[in-house]
Amino acid sequence: SQNNIFNFFKKMLTKSRNIFVIKISIIILNSLNLEYNIELLEIIKILALCSEFTLLGVLFIKTLKNIDINKEIYELAKKVYTWGKMACIFYLEANSNEIKDWILNESTEENILYNFVAITYSDKADIRKRLKKISFKKNEFSKISFLIYSLLFLDAEKGIMFLDYKEELLINYLERAKIWLKQN
């Protein structure tokens, strides 16, 4: 029965020492199309703190019903690093200024991965809109500059050349850079 399957794989999450058994357990539990279960969610969130399981944890969270999925992913993203953070940000909806600011701030913290995440971070931090502003918060322009650099550094098919609005982005960046240099 589905209940037996659920109980078996839930037990495997906490008892197994084999990474692949744990991953398979998360995937199978995810496929059961479960209602919100706080005990299981807490187990998955603990496992997701390890970057080995973060992506599967996020995918599990995304299928749950009756919870604020974006809030759960955002809270997890603030606790993980490198690959785990990248997985969270990829699935995180940047639907508030708080989240957009956080993504912008995190973009330079994860600089070992900038080749992979520059477009995602730039989009979700909304640097296109930010570059239309007159003034910036402390360090905001430096972080935007890092993302612009990262976009320029990437291969043409992955970086700024991929963006439909690259000219607008670069023109706005150069205009803001002139103003920023005069002020600092």
What does each model-found stretch correspond to?
Residues S1-Q2, S122-N184:
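Long internal repeat-built scaffold domains in very large eukaryotic proteins
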Residues S16-I24, A48, E52, K79-W83, ...:
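Residues within HEAT/ARM-like alpha-solenoid scaffolds
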Residues L32-N37, I67-I73, E98-L104, Y114-N115, ...:
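Flexible loop/turn segments at the boundaries of HEAT repeats in alpha-solenoid HEAT proteins
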Residues D68-K71, T82-G84, I127-K129:
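Short alpha-helical linear motifs
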Residues A94-K132:
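Eukaryotic acidic, Ser/Thr-rich intrinsically disordered low-complexity regions
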